[in-house]
Amino acid sequence: MVAYAIKTPPQHGTWPEILDLWRAADDIDVFESAWTMDHFYPLVPPLDGTELESWTMLAALAQATRRLRLGCMVNGMHLRHPAVTANMAATLDHIAGGRFQLGLGAGWFQPEADAYGIPLGTLTERFDRFDEGVEVIVSLLTRTRTTFAGRYYRITDARCEPKPVQDRIPIVIGGRGPRRTLRTVARWADHWDMTRPEDTGEWTRLDAVLREHCAAIGRDPAEIRRSVHLWWATDDDPAALADTAAGLAAAGVDLVVFSMRAPYDARRLEPLAAALAA
């Protein structure tokens, strides 16, 4: 059965309105999870606007909610050393009481990286670094000790303690690249997220590619949850959004994420929830 989630990118938003909306969503059973995003600069105009930092905010939102699973779609691998990310994830899972989900991506936003002097690299470098980083994170979160020697990351007899509350924090990998991203999804992910497909057919085609990658390594593709992002504009008709979500569910999508834009108004949640439950 399809599930539903909300996403509140912190660009141009204020802490009080995001907090209010998440608390309201926590009381609406239709929404199983809530998400933010990991950037320091807004992606939509005005580009010189504000952007709250995602991990700091998630720790506070974990304390402010009791039921929603929560995470960030997705965290850029280039922004933090994967050993740091692993420790942050384990700690956040304790704060959330086992509700955290770890979203990971290769990174892409060049203006932000240039402004902060954070190396982003070529596409090949990004995905090579991403593959290494995911392996480091998964190992640190699940094994007693980790030694890894790659091109981008080297760790020696490293520990990450305490381990998460969950036996395994779900690893969410976002993207649509058929050759590299979906191959990494097949190898490491518990959950694949795709943002705004052009239509259901595009998602179906990429899902077939993911299944091929799974077959190549002997993994059951049913082990991987699938989600899709939809924009949720202020003037969107909830019934139309529900119809779109139903079409995605029929195609095999497990979770539909409704991504909002600031200003955030908690009063928008109930009409959408009613349409989804109808």
Residues of each region from the PLM?
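Active-site-adjacent structural elements that line small-molecule/cofactor binding pockets in enzymes
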Residues: 1-278
